[in-house]
Swiss-Prot record:
Glycans are attached at residues 57, 136. TNFR-Cys repeats lie at residues 27-61, 63-103, 104-143. Coiled coil: none annotated. The keyword Ribosomal protein does not apply. It is found in: Membrane. This is Tumor necrosis factor receptor superfamily member 26. It is a single-pass type I membrane protein. It comes from Mus musculus (Mouse).
């Protein structure tokens, strides 16, 4: 009898375990659980108005209102408000139902912090126009420095403007050509001098 009771108890436990597994709702990727149902998520640009009524079925979704967006599949009850550009920024990408508005600092200013929560800064100017990298919306101007200031490292670069650089190159070329010509003339004179000495010795 004891053995029979153990078998009955094991059978009962197994049945309970199987029933528990059957009651667990496993949702697929792109679905969300609502009560005991798996509902499809809303697509980008829409939000959830009402969950589905049948398992693995579509939910009732509604499009985002003007100046609102959602850029991914979701089960949100409302869309997110689009960003608003400040007066020191300009719009580079418009707000849509599937993408937020993109703003950046206006020309001549920059902001190098994440999300640019502070005001845009005026771009630095370089003395004598020695610019290594021009200023843009996210980075300040980088200048070349002849002498490093205390605590700073400067690149020891002696840079020339384009017209001056061309003049220097031409002058160097002329000097080299002149030196070669002078060397050739000296060699010719030396050879002639040697011939004259040899001729005088023969005549004597």
């Amino acid at each position: 009898m004891t053995r029979l009771r153990l078998l009955l108890l094991l059978g009962l436990l197994l049945r309970v375990a199987v029933c528990s597994v059957n009651t667990i709702t496993l949702c697929k990727i792109g679905e969300f659980k609502h009560e005991n149902l798996c509902c499809l998520q809303c697509s980008a640009g829409t939000y959830l108005r009402n969950p589905c009524q049948e398992n693995h079925n579509k939910s009732e979704c509604a499009p985002c209102d003007s100046e609102h967006f959602i850029d991914h599949k979701n089960r949100e009850s409302e869309c997110f408000p689009c960003s608003v550009c400040r007066d020191d920024q300009e719009e580079v990408a418009k707000c849509s139902r599937t993408a937020d508005r993109v703003c950046q600092c206006k020309q001549g200013t920059y902001c190098d912090s994440e999300n640019c929560l502070e005001r845009c800064h005026t771009c630095s100017s370089c003395p004598d126009g020695r610019v290594v990298r021009k200023c843009n919306a996210t980075m300040d101007t980088v200048c070349d420095k002849f002498d490093s200031e205390p605590g700073q490292s400067g690149s020891q670069c002696f840079c020339f403007s384009k017209p001056l650089g061309i003049v220097v190159i031409i002058a160097a070329f002329i000097i080299i050509i002149g030196a070669v010509i002078i060397l050739i003339l000296k060699i010719i004179c030396y050879c002639k001098r040697g011939e004259n000495i040899q001729l005088s010795s023969t005549m004597l």
